[in-house]
A protein has these predicted regions:
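Conserved structural position at the C-terminal beta-strand
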Residues: 51-53
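Structural beta-strand segments of beta-rich domains
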Residues: 2-8
Length: 204
């Protein structure tokens, strides 16, 4: 059974956390300021987290959030109809922020593995009650712009956004398409390196 380590940032006054991930109870431990749990890896790399946090004063709070890992769940097919019909894709919320944050982290790690210097700071544990500040949204936007600028992208790759203000469904699609394109380019670069190196030179 493969495992995945989840990490959630909660208020500093929290001293104990319990709860479930995808319906199963796990042990949570405070490590370097974040509450972590090692869980069974989900096939789709999606984790529905329902922690209960307790303060030293005995105040208990229930949280609910969804964490994403990798790129399996990126969304690029939002439509005007989603907005009009108010479907899940017609709103931009904590789930979207977490999905993109996790994908930014994943792509940044791939860049680092190929020797790129990467400076991004994605947040992946937004909860439904969070209201992002202007500064947090700018960091969110800048993370994407930073990654996109590291490579010569495809002609069809969307431009990075200039602002998160008044985000449209097409811009939301573009954010996630950029990440998919970067991932594909990194894969192609890795394959090209292997094919031009010694892997096919009969020495392996």
């Amino acid at each position: 059974m493969s495992a995945q380590v989840l990490s959630v940032s909660l208020p500093s006054e929290i001293i104990y956390v319990s709860g479930t991930v995808n319906g199963t109870a796990y042990t949570w431990t405070l490590i370097e300021g974040a509450w972590t749990a090692t869980v069974e890896r989900a096939a789709d790399d999606t984790y529905v987290v329902a922690p209960t946090a307790v303060t030293a004063a005995g105040v208990s709070t229930n949280y609910a959030l969804t964490l994403y890992y990798g790129l399996l769940n990126l969304i690029t097919d939002r439509t005007h109809a989603d907005v009009v019909k108010q479907t899940d894709k017609g709103f931009y919320n904590a789930s979207d922020l977490n999905r993109v944050g996790a994908a930014v982290q994943y792509v940044a790690e791939r860049f680092a593995e190929q020797g790129y210097a990467v400076a991004v700071s994605p947040k992946t544990d937004w909860i439904a009650s969070d209201i992002p500040t202007a500064s947090e949204l700018e960091t969110y936007r800048q993370n994407l712009a930073t990654l996109r600028a590291l490579l010569s992208v495809m002609p069809t790759t969307p431009e990075a956004l200039d602002s998160m203000a008044g985000l449209t469904y097409t811009e939301a699609n573009s954010i996630e398409q950029i990440l998919l394109d970067l991932d594909a380019l990194l894969t192609n670069a890795a394959l090209a390196w292997y094919q031009s190196g010694e892997l096919f030179a009969g020495e392996v």
